[in-house]
């Protein structure tokens, strides 16, 4: 089972949670008691069923995760009580922040509704076909890297690798990319020139490598990289369902850009700043 932190970071939602016949009390505190159903109901929107997993009841979680859930739930209740006893919600600063938050939430809801109502089946199909055409015949590679601060450090790591050093162990020891270091520096699969992936300098060097080949140090805005290609294979063509999130995001970005542009035009927006290439006084 995935770690609790992974479950909470997911944006997927359970459609329903089935509770057992017995709604057990799992904790008590001065303010009352906590039941399994309360925990599951509280965190239901944040739970995610990973592939092959079935989380229907509180008992499906490992004991250590059950304890974490209970503590988070009770701590939220205790903090809520502390807020109620304080005067924080009546302060001017809080009210201003609350109003700003409400405005932001309202804008997000407005945009979400506008985007949803303007994505048609034809738009989706056209964008999907364009997306698939762009993937046909392309290759994807599985890459790992070791990120360090300076060229000197990169050369040191490269020398260790040249002398038979283990890439996985060196990534764990030296890499500044903590998100991948613990997994041997593995980033995953990338496709050349695919928007939203990696910086061009990294991609160009990576795609020039053979499988199991290690690069010379590569400089990017993040630092210095030692790159290793672990695998190469053709890019699989996703079904419409598999590509739905990607296509929806592409269409949403296009619709949003046009919507904002139209609003600016209707408002007759004129920026009064000097041109970017204009000369300023010395």
Swiss-Prot record:
Its EC number is 5.2.1.8. The keyword Repeat does not apply. GO terms for molecular function: peptidyl-prolyl cis-trans isomerase activity. Residues 138-231 form the PpiC domain. It is found in: Cell outer membrane. It comes from the Bacteria. One of its GO terms (cellular component) is cell outer membrane. Residues 1-20 form the signal peptide. Keywords: Cell outer membrane, Isomerase, Membrane, Rotamase, Signal. It catalyses: [protein]-peptidylproline (omega=180) = [protein]-peptidylproline (omega=0). Belongs to the PpiC/parvulin rotamase family. This is Parvulin-like PPIase.
